[in-house]
Amino acid sequence: IEVPYENVGKFVKEKDPIYDVLAAAAKNFEHNLSDLDASEQVRNYLVNERKISPQISKKFNLGYALKSWDALSQTLLDNGFSEEILIKAGLAKRNKEGKLFDVFRDRLIFPIKDRKGRIVGFGGRVMSQEDQPKYLNTGETEVFQKGRELYGFFESLEDRKNLKEIYVVEG
């Protein structure tokens, strides 16, 4: 049986820009959480209400999506990513007029990693009291299928030598 190596290589290379834009988005979200005055409420929520230390926040690459309709999209476009790749990665959508807008706005962001540690999607908890879903996940994409990934699994692999037990919970 002949194995089509060239096709497999092309398939992987086509996914590379998606992984790249997701990694760039994660860095942007992390920066927003750690360095911006606008995210002070979110930092306080993590530390005071959820008892999540800055060290744990950093380990899991937690971030914050600004309230703006297009802050992330504009940052990523300014860094050379195309509108098409933002949409393919599940980071942006188009409104009825065709204008690009961010999927995640005013949310605490949880990057979801695959078994190799690559960011494949995001979970976001709303921080405002507006009428919207409390949690929002990246939609299905070429690199993210919700049923295939387990949040925190990659991080648990890093710590497995120091753990006696692992609990898997929902919600």
Put a short name on every predicted segment.
Residues 1-88:
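Non-catalytic accessory segments of DNA primases and related replication-initiation nucleases
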Residues 10-25, 68-171:
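Phosphate-handling DNA/RNA-contact segment within nucleic-acid enzymes
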